[in-house]
Amino acid sequence: MILKKGAEADLYLEDFKDVFGFDFYNEKIVIKKRVKKNYRINEIDDMIRGFRTVKEAKIINKAKISGVYSPVLYLVDLKEKSIVMEYINGIRLKEHFSSKGLDKKIGFQIGKSVGSMHKAGIIHGDLTTSNMILSDGKVYFIDFGLSEESEEIEKQGIDVHLLRQALESTHFDISEELFKIIIEGYSDVVGNKKKDEILQRIEQIEKRGRYRKRD
């Protein structure tokens, strides 16, 4: 069953048994398959999709090792350019905050997880509440398709800046207080000095954005 069609990849929901030939606690799995681009030369397209598939799988695994809740990887299929992973059964934080309002405990969890990723040299690249799932009281991060490995303060600042923009766009009524709580969780992992550096960098990023709009 198709879950989502995207510009870069399609997501499918399947039974574990149908893919691997045996049952595993009635588990369901997600298959993320990168879309072939007909405008590219076949060999180049295969190389790009293969590289991005391996890169994403590697970063998901690195995030999990770093203590960030993320899907378990079952298989990386280079021939099909796909990742077979655990299906996280829960509610997206987009819906959770929309129905429950401000949730300080969850906000703090988000901050700690983002801090853990940055401390491990991971830039998620798409930190929205649509890419976070609440399951059994834990916040799982999904869709690492735009992620990369970097410890650059600029890229970390952009990561957090885009998260704040996503909160303001989707959860305007609680975004300011929620972002403060997220930053508290972030600081709990990376420390006050690093937290201050990130906030200063976000200010610089926002100033650059305002200057571009004037131009």
Spans of features found by a protein language model:
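Short hydrophobic-acidic sequence motifs that mark active-site Asp/Glu residues
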Residues: 13, 28-32, 84, 141-143, ...
